[in-house]
Structure formats: C-alpha cells, structure tokens
Design a protein with these regions (language model features):
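Pyridoxal 5′-phosphate
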Residues: 1-374
Length: 374
C-alpha cells in the first residue's frame, strides 16, 4: 500500500455518485455516499407513509447506536452525546445551558473562528487570547502558565481551523487543562473524522457534513457527566430515565439526517480511522507540494502539517472570491474563498482553501495547479 492509501481512495470513490467536476472543498461540505443518500431518502419516505413520530420511534435503536459510535470517536459514552443541528448550534446549546456569570473569561486562540467569538460575547463571556507560536499553534507551556496565573471559566480550543490547516496540540492542551482543573471545550467541526479527537476534553462538538461525509443539518455535542451536571436545559425532560444530555436534543431535529450520519460514521470506522487520517494527511502534503508557487499563490501551512486543509495566499492584486468563481465556471473545480471574518484576530486578508477528501486524486490536484498557473 502506498503512503497515499490509494486503495482506500478508490473504495471511498466507488461508494459515491460520480463527480460532475473536481470537488476539493470537503472542509465546507463533503460528498455523501450513495448508501447514506438512500438511507436519508428512505426515512423521509417512511415518514410520509407511516407518520413522522411512528418512524422516529422505530429508528431510535439506530439513532442510539449513532450516539454510541460518535461518543466512541470523542472518548465518551452514548449517554454523554446529544444530536443537534450543527456545530454552531452545539456551541449555542452548550453556552445556553452552562449559564456562566457575565464577564467570565474564556481562553481561546487568537485565530479563533469568528462566529465562535460572536457566540461567546453574546453569552456575556470575555475571550482571552491563549499564547501561540508564529504558526498560530497553541504553546502548551505558556498556556499552563496562563491557567495558573488567571484561570478562565473554561478553555475553548478549535482543534483545526476553518481558515488554516494547522492542527493544534489538543492532547497537550487537554493535559494542561486537566492538571489545572479548568474545563476544556473542543471545537471539532473540522477535526471530527479528520484527526483524533479522543483527547479527554470535557466537551466536544462537531458536524456531520464535513469530514464524516454525512448529511447537512446534523451536529453533535458530547459533554462528560461532571460538566453535564452543571448544565440546565431550556426544556427539561419529563422522562427521568433518559440521560441528562438528551434534554438538549430538539424534537424538531433532522431525524433522517441523523440516520444518514450514523451510516456515514459506520463507513468511516469501516475504512479505519488511522488509515483515513494517514491518507488525508498525505493528500494535504501532496496539495501543498503541487500548489505552492503556482501562479504566484503561496501555501500558508507547513508542508508536513497532518491535515488535508491547505490555504493559499493570493498574489498581489488577485481577487480570491473571483478566482473561486472562475475555477468553478471554467474548470469545474470547487474550493472555498475564506475571508478574514473567519479568524478576525489572525487573518489580514482572504485565502483560497483547498480541502480534498479520501476520494480526491493527484490528477485533480494537478488540474487545480494548472488552473491557478494560467
């Protein structure tokens, strides 16, 4: 098997509809498998034939299995997991239930995701920047000092950013937080299904539609019992037998999407998480090798960064959103134009984000390199 795990790429590709172009945008939304698409459609059809709540009850064992396997990815139990509608919704749910005093400090990266900062401030919390190195990577020793001198209410760590493919030293930060007795909340929106998130965080949240390649409209929130006991749901459950985290699930949830996510996680596990991570990291390296310098574009990340996300700074005078539009219109290549609002404390201008999944090929990366060079 080659370092790129080409057999894994081929099997992942064979389970999906044929691409109309070149999809290199999995950090935005991955391509679902035919099996996942069929399962979502079948559940929706059964809702129409039998009634939504009848089918919901019948599907509960499968949904519960999903809580279990997702909990396993996060190092938690099924009882610790709640389905929500998105990663953004998961953070909103957590903050609404925690009800921390106004002005409470929250340590986060200088390159924190812009919408996360907005949510923290809307909840009355005060973000405090964690110390980082020149690549924007958290410095565990300096974070340890910060927690000792002025412990925040919790640490919020975005494991892998929306604007940059730099993997944070989350395991080291988790150990530092644990030793200091400070809760760690891990934003795994770009990490779940991409890098290992079983690190001992007190809360982990993520989404279906990115690296797990599940349906849109589904997110997941995992909270360990010690922290869950401090949360107050807006609508407490009347069923004392249900785990406390179940009270944070909406009865208007996208049940068909949850079923699709359960199947998508099954496909991820069948592929082998270690092999998935290895191929994604290899594709990230191959992307950076091919794209750095093409047409004057420069890669932001270090060459060996173990992620599949690559961001490109444009040459002077080049419009990034216009380039994205041109790539789609002229070459059928899908990427993301990421503006500085994604990380207002770190970004000074837009970047082009490239994020191949397992089914991407080197020919597709070469096609992008050629398109950028012309």
């Amino acid at each position: 098997m080659s370092p790129l795990h080409d057999d894994l790429g081929a099997s992942w590709r064979a389970r999906r509809p044929r691409q109309a172009g070149h999809h290199l945008d999995s950090a935005a939304c991955s391509r679902q498998s035919t099996r996942v698409l069929d399962a979502v459609a079948l559940h929706a059809r059964h809702e129409a034939e039998l009634g939504g709540y009848v089918v919901l009850q019948a599907a509960e064992p499968l949904v519960q299995q999903g809580r279990s396997v997702l909990g396993g990815l996060m190092g938690m139990a099924a009882a610790d997991v709640a389905f929500v509608e998105s990663a953004t919704g998961a953070l909103a749910t957590l903050l609404a239930g925690w009800r921390l005093p106004a002005g409470s400090a929250v340590a986060c990266l200088p390159g924190e995701y812009g919408p996360n900062l907005m949510q923290l401030r809307s909840a009355g919390l005060s973000p405090v920047a964690m110390p980082v190195d020149g690549a924007g990577r958290a410095d565990p020793a300096a974070v340890e000092s910060l927690l000792a001198q002025a412990p925040p209410a919790f640490v919020h760590l975005t494991h892998l950013g929306s604007h940059r493919g730099t993997v944070q030293p989350a395991a080291d930060i988790a150990a530092v937080c644990r030793a200091a007795g400070v809760p760690l909340v891990l934003d795994a929106a770009q990490a779940l299904g991409h890098v290992d998130v079983d690190l001992g965080a007190d809360a982990v949240y993520g989404t279906s539609r990115k690296w797990l390649a599940g349906p849109r409209g589904v997110g997941v929130l995992g909270v360990r019992p010690e922290l869950a006991a401090r949360l107050t749901p807006a609508l407490p459950s009347s069923d004392a037998d249900l785990p406390p985290m179940r009270a944070f699930e909406s009865h208007e949830g996208h049940v068909a999407g949850r079923i699709g996510l359960v199947l998508a996680v099954g496909e991820h596990l069948a592929a082998g998480p270690d092999a998935v991570r290895a191929r994604l990291a290899a594709l990230g390296r191959a992307t950076r090798e091919r794209l750095d310098g093409c047409g004057g574009w420069s890669v932001v990340e270090e060459l060996g960064e173990p992620s599949a996300i690559t961001t490109l700074r444009p040459p002077d005078g080049v419009d990034v959103p216009a380039t994205r539009a041109r790539l789609i219109a002229e070459h059928g290549i899908v990427t993301t134009a990421a503006g500085p609002e994604r990380a207002p404390g770190e970004m000074t201008g837009p970047v082009l984000r490239v994020s191949p999944h397992l089914d991407a090929t080197l020919d597709q990366l070469d096609a992008l390199a050629n398109a950028l060079a012309t």
